[in-house]
Every structure is written in structure tokens, then in C-alpha cells.
Amino acid sequence: MGSGTSAVNPQVGAIVRGRGHHGGMVHRTRVVKAARRAEVRLPELVGFTGGELTPDGDYDGLEFRDLDFAGQDGAGARFMDCALTSCALDETGLRHARVLDSVLTGIRGVGTDLAEATLRDVELVDARLGGAQLHGAVLERVLVRGGKIDYLNLRNARLKDVVFESCVLVEPDFGGARLERVAFADCVLKGADLTAATLVDVDLRGAAELDVARGLDRLSGAVISHAQLLDLAPVLAAEMGLRVAEV
């Protein structure tokens, strides 16, 4: 690299500046690796007419529309190339379920159990959920766009290439979770718990509101904006036991 030149590697979002091979300081700023967004392309679907969900059920290429699955047990079920639209999932049991290459639009429910489930290449659009249980779950290439999710339990979950976009998350619990290449874009994050979480290439700069209730010390693997740093300053000072006073 020649004197005063700069190079950008778009795959890793890194900016490198330096003076080349003739000495002097080389300054490297690694911003953040971008999340790979889910891009689901569904085949032609067949309407679901099977009645209730069943444990370990196998659902492939189906459309579930305006159905009430409240209280039903679909533990261990597999959903592949499916669309769930405007379905009720109140206390629906989907523990260990696998949701693959699917689109969930306008789903709603309280206490939906997706503990230790796998969501891969999934779009979750305009969901209205409360107390959804995804502890120990694996989320890979998942897009959460729009909607509101209260008290989301992601304790000890693994998130990789996940994007939260234009949604509201109230008191999400990421305790002990691993977040890698996760982005928050125009997303409201209220009262987040990051206790014992591991963050790698987590981009919080696009969050419309950023409120971390616990686990501020786990933000070392995240990127925030200058404005967000100022907003977090009082909480950071309190966390460090730092007193701030005028002269």
C-alpha cells in the first residue's frame, strides 16, 4: 500500500489506513462484520388441512393461515418451506422444533414455547409476542422485521447472522447467549439483559433506542455510535462506581 492510501474490504467492513512499507504507524479500524440477511424464497405452497399440530410432525411446503394453535403440542416438529400467516400461538408447545426456510407473518401469542428450537433461514414479520421462550435455541440467518416482542427469553441461545429491523423488543433476556454478526436496525431495545452474554460483531448503531438494564460489561464485542455512548454514559458511570460532579 502506498503512502496515504486506504483500502476497504466490504466483506468484513474493515477500514485500513497506513503509510506502506517504508515505516510509520499503520492504523487499522475494524468496524464490524455484517450479518448475512435471510432471503427466503418459498415454493408454491399447499394449504394446511391437517387439524392440530402433532409432536414430531413433518410439515413441508405448507401454508398455515388464520389458524389457532393455542395450547397445542408440536414439540420436535419440522417446518420446511412453510408460511405461517396470522396464526395464534398462545402457549403453543414447539420445544425442539425446527423451522427452516420459512416465513412467519403476523403471528401472535403469549408464552409460545420454542425452547431449544432451531430457526434457520427464517423471516419473522410483524409478530406480536409476549414471553416467548427461546432459551437454548439456535437462530441462524433470521430476519425479525416489524412488530413487538415483550419479555423475549433468549437465555443461552446462539444467534448468528440475525437482523432485528424496525421492531420493538421490551426487556429481552440475552443472558448467557452468544450473539455473532447480529444487527439492530431502526429497532427499539428496552431494558435488555446481557448478563454473561458473548457478543461478536454485534452492530447496535442503527438502534433507534438503546437501553441496557444489565450486563453493560458484555458490550465489548459490540459497536455503538457516539450518540449512543453519550446516552449510556450515566449507566456506564454507575456500573463503574464513578461519581460525576461539577467543579
Give, region by region, the residue ranges found by the protein language model.
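N-terminal amphipathic/basic-hydrophobic helices that include classical n-h-c signal peptides
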Residues: M1-G24
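Tandem repeat scaffolds
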Residues: V26-V247
